Protein backbone atom coordinates (compact mmCIF):
# COMPACT_ATOMS: atom_id res chain seq x y z
CA UNK A 1 0.00 0.00 0.00
CA UNK A 2 1.11 3.58 -0.72
CA UNK A 3 1.05 6.33 1.87
CA UNK A 4 1.96 9.99 1.83
CA UNK A 5 5.14 9.46 3.88
CA UNK A 6 6.74 8.21 0.67
CA UNK A 7 6.86 11.83 -0.43
CA UNK A 8 8.94 12.60 2.65
CA UNK A 9 11.24 9.58 2.46
CA UNK A 10 14.86 9.61 1.39
CA UNK A 11 15.63 7.31 -1.52
CA UNK A 12 18.64 5.12 -2.22
CA UNK A 13 18.66 4.17 -5.90
CA UNK A 14 21.23 1.84 -7.43
CA UNK A 15 23.20 2.14 -4.19
CA UNK A 16 23.38 5.95 -4.38
CA UNK A 17 21.62 8.08 -1.71
CA UNK A 18 19.45 10.78 -3.26
CA UNK A 19 19.97 14.19 -1.72
CA UNK A 20 16.33 15.33 -1.59
CA UNK A 21 13.01 13.69 -0.79
CA UNK A 22 10.25 13.89 -3.42
CA UNK A 23 8.47 16.57 -1.38
CA UNK A 24 11.62 18.67 -1.19
CA UNK A 25 12.04 18.36 -4.96
CA UNK A 26 8.46 19.55 -5.45
CA UNK A 27 8.96 22.50 -3.13
CA UNK A 28 6.62 21.33 -0.36
CA UNK A 29 7.01 21.48 3.40
CA UNK A 30 8.99 18.50 4.61
CA UNK A 31 7.99 16.55 7.73
CA UNK A 32 10.09 17.26 10.82
CA UNK A 33 11.61 13.81 10.39
CA UNK A 34 12.48 11.49 7.50
CA UNK A 35 10.60 8.17 7.41
CA UNK A 36 12.52 5.00 6.71
CA UNK A 37 14.60 5.25 3.53
CA UNK A 38 13.32 3.55 0.40
CA UNK A 39 15.88 1.36 -1.36
CA UNK A 40 15.37 0.33 -4.97
CA UNK A 41 17.16 -0.07 -8.28
CA UNK A 42 16.51 1.28 -11.76
CA UNK A 43 15.21 -0.83 -14.59
CA UNK A 44 16.74 -0.41 -18.03
CA UNK A 45 14.54 -0.69 -21.12
CA UNK A 46 14.67 -4.03 -22.84
CA UNK A 47 15.65 -4.32 -26.48
CA UNK A 48 12.62 -3.48 -28.60
CA UNK A 49 12.10 -5.18 -31.95
CA UNK A 50 9.63 -3.49 -34.31
CA UNK A 51 8.45 -5.13 -37.51
CA UNK A 52 6.97 -2.05 -39.16
CA UNK A 53 5.21 -1.89 -42.50
CA UNK A 54 4.55 1.48 -44.12
CA UNK A 55 1.56 -0.01 -45.93
CA UNK A 56 -0.21 -0.68 -42.63
CA UNK A 57 -0.64 2.92 -41.43
CA UNK A 58 -4.40 2.50 -41.19
CA UNK A 59 -4.03 -0.68 -39.16
CA UNK A 60 -1.57 1.00 -36.79
CA UNK A 61 -3.91 3.95 -36.37
CA UNK A 62 -6.79 1.61 -35.51
CA UNK A 63 -4.61 -0.08 -32.87
CA UNK A 64 -3.69 3.28 -31.35
CA UNK A 65 -7.33 4.41 -31.32
CA UNK A 66 -8.24 1.26 -29.38
CA UNK A 67 -5.73 1.98 -26.58
CA UNK A 68 -7.57 3.62 -23.66
CA UNK A 69 -4.46 5.44 -22.40
CA UNK A 70 -0.70 5.35 -22.50
CA UNK A 71 0.81 3.12 -19.82
CA UNK A 72 3.71 4.27 -17.68
CA UNK A 73 6.60 1.85 -18.15
CA UNK A 74 9.15 2.06 -15.34
CA UNK A 75 12.26 2.34 -17.58
CA UNK A 76 10.68 5.42 -19.22
CA UNK A 77 9.39 7.11 -16.04
CA UNK A 78 11.37 10.32 -16.54
CA UNK A 79 10.47 10.63 -20.21
CA UNK A 80 6.82 9.87 -19.43
CA UNK A 81 6.70 12.55 -16.72
CA UNK A 82 8.22 15.22 -18.95
CA UNK A 83 5.85 14.28 -21.76
CA UNK A 84 2.84 14.64 -19.42
CA UNK A 85 3.86 18.24 -18.70
CA UNK A 86 4.48 19.00 -22.37
CA UNK A 87 1.17 17.48 -23.49
CA UNK A 88 -0.79 19.36 -20.80
CA UNK A 89 0.77 22.64 -21.93
CA UNK A 90 -0.03 21.84 -25.55
CA UNK A 91 -3.65 21.16 -24.63
CA UNK A 92 -3.70 24.68 -23.17
CA UNK A 93 -2.10 26.22 -26.26
CA UNK A 94 -5.40 26.96 -28.00
CA UNK A 95 -7.31 28.17 -24.95
CA UNK A 96 -9.14 31.49 -24.77
CA UNK A 97 -7.64 34.51 -23.07
CA UNK A 98 -4.26 36.16 -23.11
CA UNK A 99 -1.30 34.45 -21.47
CA UNK A 100 2.29 33.44 -21.99
CA UNK A 101 3.84 30.15 -20.97
CA UNK A 102 5.33 31.47 -17.73
CA UNK A 103 1.86 32.58 -16.53
CA UNK A 104 0.66 28.99 -16.24
CA UNK A 105 0.61 26.85 -13.09
CA UNK A 106 0.54 23.07 -12.92
CA UNK A 107 -1.48 20.67 -10.80
CA UNK A 108 -0.01 17.16 -10.66
CA UNK A 109 -1.55 13.94 -9.40
CA UNK A 110 0.55 10.78 -9.11
CA UNK A 111 -1.18 7.40 -9.08
CA UNK A 112 1.28 4.82 -7.83
CA UNK A 113 1.64 1.45 -6.18
CA UNK A 114 4.66 -0.57 -5.15
CA UNK A 115 5.07 -3.23 -7.84
CA UNK A 116 8.40 -4.58 -6.68
CA UNK A 117 11.87 -3.94 -8.03
CA UNK A 118 12.09 -0.77 -10.10
CA UNK A 119 8.72 0.72 -9.18
CA UNK A 120 9.86 3.10 -6.44
CA UNK A 121 12.98 4.13 -8.35
CA UNK A 122 10.66 4.93 -11.26
CA UNK A 123 8.46 7.03 -8.96
CA UNK A 124 11.45 9.06 -7.81
CA UNK A 125 12.68 9.55 -11.38
CA UNK A 126 9.22 10.66 -12.45
CA UNK A 127 9.25 13.32 -9.71
CA UNK A 128 12.70 14.61 -10.62
CA UNK A 129 11.97 14.50 -14.34
CA UNK A 130 8.70 16.40 -14.00
CA UNK A 131 10.00 18.96 -11.49
CA UNK A 132 13.16 19.72 -13.46
CA UNK A 133 11.25 20.07 -16.72
CA UNK A 134 8.72 22.43 -15.13
CA UNK A 135 11.47 24.49 -13.49
CA UNK A 136 13.36 24.83 -16.77
CA UNK A 137 10.15 26.20 -18.32
CA UNK A 138 9.77 28.64 -15.35
CA UNK A 139 6.51 26.99 -14.33
CA UNK A 140 5.17 26.64 -10.80
CA UNK A 141 3.75 23.36 -9.49
CA UNK A 142 0.83 24.86 -7.58
CA UNK A 143 -0.29 21.61 -5.98
CA UNK A 144 0.37 17.89 -6.15
CA UNK A 145 -0.92 14.66 -4.66
CA UNK A 146 -0.13 10.96 -4.44
CA UNK A 147 -2.85 8.32 -4.40
CA UNK A 148 -2.96 4.54 -4.63
CA UNK A 149 -3.44 3.23 -8.14
CA UNK A 150 -1.93 1.89 -11.32
CA UNK A 151 1.17 4.03 -12.03
CA UNK A 152 0.19 7.12 -13.98
CA UNK A 153 0.64 10.89 -13.82
CA UNK A 154 -2.08 13.46 -14.44
CA UNK A 155 -1.01 17.03 -15.16
CA UNK A 156 -3.52 19.87 -15.40
CA UNK A 157 -2.96 23.51 -16.30
CA UNK A 158 -4.83 26.36 -14.62
CA UNK A 159 -6.14 28.67 -17.37
CA UNK A 160 -7.34 32.29 -17.22
CA UNK A 161 -10.47 31.49 -19.25
CA UNK A 162 -12.30 28.22 -19.98
CA UNK A 163 -12.86 26.97 -23.50
CA UNK A 164 -10.97 26.88 -26.79
CA UNK A 165 -10.20 29.90 -28.92
CA UNK A 166 -10.47 27.95 -32.19
CA UNK A 167 -11.67 24.55 -33.44
CA UNK A 168 -9.58 21.39 -33.35
CA UNK A 169 -10.78 20.16 -36.75
CA UNK A 170 -9.89 21.34 -40.24
CA UNK A 171 -12.00 24.08 -41.79
CA UNK A 172 -13.14 23.44 -45.39
CA UNK A 173 -10.73 25.85 -47.10
CA UNK A 174 -8.84 23.97 -49.85
CA UNK A 175 -6.41 26.88 -50.34
CA UNK A 176 -5.32 26.89 -46.71
CA UNK A 177 -2.27 25.13 -45.30
CA UNK A 178 -1.79 22.69 -42.45
CA UNK A 179 1.47 23.37 -40.62
CA UNK A 180 3.29 20.99 -38.26
CA UNK A 181 5.68 22.27 -35.59
CA UNK A 182 7.48 19.71 -33.41
CA UNK A 183 8.16 21.32 -30.01
CA UNK A 184 11.21 19.20 -29.17
CA UNK A 185 14.43 18.28 -30.95
CA UNK A 186 14.45 14.65 -29.82
CA UNK A 187 14.82 11.80 -32.29
CA UNK A 188 11.64 10.11 -33.50
CA UNK A 189 11.48 6.95 -31.39
CA UNK A 190 8.67 4.56 -30.53
CA UNK A 191 9.69 3.36 -27.05
CA UNK A 192 6.88 3.89 -24.54
CA UNK A 193 4.42 5.03 -27.23
CA UNK A 194 0.82 3.98 -27.73
CA UNK A 195 1.81 2.15 -30.90
CA UNK A 196 4.51 0.20 -29.06
CA UNK A 197 1.97 -0.57 -26.35
CA UNK A 198 -0.58 -1.76 -28.93
CA UNK A 199 2.05 -3.95 -30.60
CA UNK A 200 3.11 -5.42 -27.27
CA UNK A 201 6.66 -4.01 -27.46
CA UNK A 202 7.97 -2.68 -24.12
CA UNK A 203 11.57 -1.98 -25.11
CA UNK A 204 13.53 0.31 -27.35
CA UNK A 205 14.46 3.96 -26.69
CA UNK A 206 11.85 6.66 -26.13
CA UNK A 207 12.01 10.34 -27.13
CA UNK A 208 14.01 12.22 -24.48
CA UNK A 209 11.76 15.34 -24.32
CA UNK A 210 14.42 17.57 -22.74
CA UNK A 211 14.86 20.69 -24.90
CA UNK A 212 12.88 23.15 -22.80
CA UNK A 213 14.44 26.21 -24.43
CA UNK A 214 13.21 25.12 -27.83
CA UNK A 215 9.81 24.16 -26.41
CA UNK A 216 9.46 27.68 -25.00
CA UNK A 217 10.34 29.30 -28.32
CA UNK A 218 7.83 27.13 -30.18
CA UNK A 219 5.12 27.78 -27.60
CA UNK A 220 5.60 31.55 -27.72
CA UNK A 221 5.30 31.91 -31.47
CA UNK A 222 2.43 29.43 -32.00
CA UNK A 223 0.52 30.96 -29.08
CA UNK A 224 0.83 34.34 -30.81
CA UNK A 225 -0.65 32.81 -33.97
CA UNK A 226 -3.60 31.59 -31.89
CA UNK A 227 -4.20 34.89 -30.10
CA UNK A 228 -3.79 36.97 -33.28
CA UNK A 229 -6.20 34.83 -35.31
CA UNK A 230 -3.53 33.63 -37.73
CA UNK A 231 -4.25 30.01 -36.80
CA UNK A 232 -7.83 29.16 -37.77
CA UNK A 233 -7.81 25.62 -36.35
CA UNK A 234 -5.25 23.65 -34.36
CA UNK A 235 -4.61 20.36 -32.60
CA UNK A 236 -1.97 19.25 -30.11
CA UNK A 237 0.35 16.39 -31.03
CA UNK A 238 0.64 14.10 -28.02
CA UNK A 239 -0.39 10.53 -27.27
CA UNK A 240 -0.55 8.59 -30.52
CA UNK A 241 1.82 11.00 -32.22
CA UNK A 242 1.38 13.02 -35.38
CA UNK A 243 -0.80 10.36 -37.01
CA UNK A 244 -3.39 10.47 -34.24
CA UNK A 245 -3.47 14.28 -34.36
CA UNK A 246 -3.95 14.32 -38.13
CA UNK A 247 -6.77 11.83 -37.75
CA UNK A 248 -8.45 14.03 -35.13
CA UNK A 249 -8.24 17.09 -37.38
CA UNK A 250 -10.07 15.20 -40.13
CA UNK A 251 -12.95 14.08 -37.89
CA UNK A 252 -15.44 16.66 -39.21
CA UNK A 253 -15.36 15.24 -42.72
CA UNK A 254 -12.65 17.47 -44.20
CA UNK A 255 -9.84 15.33 -45.60
CA UNK A 256 -6.15 15.97 -46.11
CA UNK A 257 -3.36 14.89 -48.41
CA UNK A 258 -0.43 15.10 -45.99
CA UNK A 259 3.08 14.93 -47.42
CA UNK A 260 5.65 14.10 -44.74
CA UNK A 261 8.59 13.73 -47.15
CA UNK A 262 10.44 16.79 -45.83
CA UNK A 263 9.78 15.74 -42.25
CA UNK A 264 11.26 12.29 -42.83
CA UNK A 265 14.30 13.84 -44.49
CA UNK A 266 14.77 16.30 -41.63
CA UNK A 267 14.60 13.35 -39.23
CA UNK A 268 17.59 11.77 -40.94
CA UNK A 269 15.57 9.57 -43.26
CA UNK A 270 13.56 8.09 -40.40
CA UNK A 271 10.95 5.46 -41.18
CA UNK A 272 7.57 7.14 -41.86
CA UNK A 273 5.87 4.93 -39.26
CA UNK A 274 8.29 6.13 -36.58
CA UNK A 275 7.83 9.75 -37.62
CA UNK A 276 4.04 9.48 -37.52
CA UNK A 277 3.65 7.53 -34.27
CA UNK A 278 6.58 8.77 -32.17
CA UNK A 279 5.11 10.89 -29.38
CA UNK A 280 7.18 14.05 -29.68
CA UNK A 281 5.22 17.06 -28.36
CA UNK A 282 4.07 19.37 -31.12
CA UNK A 283 1.23 21.26 -32.73
CA UNK A 284 -0.71 21.20 -35.98
CA UNK A 285 -2.37 24.42 -37.06
CA UNK A 286 -4.26 25.55 -40.13
CA UNK A 287 -3.58 28.94 -41.72
CA UNK A 288 -5.01 30.88 -44.65
CA UNK A 289 -2.88 30.86 -47.79
CA UNK A 290 -2.52 34.65 -47.49
CA UNK A 291 -0.77 34.25 -44.11
CA UNK A 292 1.87 31.76 -45.26
CA UNK A 293 4.62 34.33 -45.82
CA UNK A 294 3.91 35.86 -42.41
CA UNK A 295 4.20 32.62 -40.45
CA UNK A 296 7.27 31.66 -42.48
CA UNK A 297 9.00 34.90 -41.44
CA UNK A 298 7.95 34.61 -37.79
CA UNK A 299 9.04 31.00 -37.43
CA UNK A 300 12.37 31.67 -39.12
CA UNK A 301 12.89 34.68 -36.84
CA UNK A 302 12.43 32.44 -33.79
CA UNK A 303 14.58 29.71 -35.37
CA UNK A 304 11.65 27.29 -35.13
CA UNK A 305 11.48 24.41 -37.60
CA UNK A 306 8.13 23.85 -39.29
CA UNK A 307 6.70 21.61 -41.98
CA UNK A 308 3.84 22.51 -44.38
CA UNK A 309 1.99 19.20 -44.73
CA UNK A 310 -0.56 20.11 -47.38
CA UNK A 311 -4.05 21.43 -48.09
CA UNK A 312 -7.44 20.26 -46.79
CA UNK A 313 -9.64 18.26 -49.16
CA UNK A 314 -13.33 19.12 -49.41
CA UNK A 315 -14.29 16.45 -51.95
CA UNK A 316 -14.99 13.73 -49.41
CA UNK A 317 -11.49 12.26 -49.60
CA UNK A 318 -10.14 10.84 -46.31
CA UNK A 319 -6.77 11.47 -44.71
CA UNK A 320 -3.96 10.29 -46.98
CA UNK A 321 -0.27 10.18 -46.10
CA UNK A 322 2.54 10.55 -48.64
CA UNK A 323 6.18 10.11 -47.72
CA UNK A 324 8.10 9.97 -50.98
CA UNK A 325 6.74 12.80 -53.09
CA UNK A 326 7.90 16.30 -53.94
CA UNK A 327 9.37 18.52 -51.24
CA UNK A 328 7.23 21.09 -49.46
CA UNK A 329 9.08 23.82 -51.41
CA UNK A 330 7.90 22.15 -54.60
CA UNK A 331 4.36 22.03 -53.26
CA UNK A 332 4.49 25.73 -52.37
CA UNK A 333 5.77 26.68 -55.83
CA UNK A 334 3.09 24.54 -57.44
CA UNK A 335 0.45 26.29 -55.30
CA UNK A 336 1.71 29.73 -56.33
CA UNK A 337 1.51 28.78 -59.99
CA UNK A 338 -2.13 27.63 -59.86
Language model features by range: what are they?
Residues 1-30, 113-153, 219, 225-338:
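Glycine-/charge-enriched secondary-structure boundary and capping motifs
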Residues 196-228, 232:
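A glycine- and small/hydrophobic-rich beta-loop-beta segment
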Amino acid sequence: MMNSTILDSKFIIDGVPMELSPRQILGGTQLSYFPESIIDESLDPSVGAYDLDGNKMGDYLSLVRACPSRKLLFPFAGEYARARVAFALLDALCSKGHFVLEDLNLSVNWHWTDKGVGSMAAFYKSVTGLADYAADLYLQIADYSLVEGEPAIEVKVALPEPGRALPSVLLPDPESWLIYVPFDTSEYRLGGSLLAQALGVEGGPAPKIEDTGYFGDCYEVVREFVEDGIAISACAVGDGGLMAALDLMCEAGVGLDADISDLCRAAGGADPVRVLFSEIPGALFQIRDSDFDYIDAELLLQDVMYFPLGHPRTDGSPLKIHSGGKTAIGSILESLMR
